[in-house]
Amino acid sequence: MDSKRNGEALVQIFVDADACPVVGIIETIAEKYNIPITLLCDTNHILYSNYSEVMVVGAGTDAVDYKLISICHKGDIVVSQDYGVAAMALGKGAYAIHQSGKWYTNNNIDQMRMERHLNKKARRSSHKNHIKGPKKRTEEDDVRFAQSFEKMLMMVQEKFQKNTKTKRKSMTFYFVYHSTAISVPDTSKCS
């Protein structure tokens, strides 16, 4: 996208990249749409990328999470498996997606956080009630994420373009002709 926010692209993707299995998929799709990505990781997970900006944050509990939230803005896309990060991103008006492809929304985030809390509580309560961890990631999981992520990216891009067109239609251009200002509304269609 050509529009800028303080010298930066208006829509950006921020990835909580510590042990994120879908970084390659995110980069492939984002590059297709020319959307910039920032991969955030701590000093224990050094990443390299030919497309994304890699931001290494000092080690510490939730250091990456807090940095990600401090730099994302309304309309950005956040990729994280952390429900707390997703909730904070939604609170800032950003879009959030899990590495499984599930979209976090204001309608489902509270229930997801409650389920996580109950599962954590059950794991701590007894060894007899041991809840297994997640299954090994499959190729189908990657396909599901790619489809869901691209759908989100297209939706965000469409909203951005619609907002840009609305703003341009409401602009008035002024021409100076023989020292007289003439107001002419912009009626051209934006592409």
Question: PLM features: residue spans?
Answer:
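Short polybasic linear motifs
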Residues: 166
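Short, intrinsically disordered C-terminal tails of secreted or membrane-associated proteins
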Residues: 182-190
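Nuclease catalytic cores that cleave nucleic-acid phosphodiester bonds
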Residues: 2-163
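Intrinsic-disorder-associated, low-complexity terminal segments enriched in Asp/Asn/His/Tyr and depleted
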Residues: 163, 174-178, 186
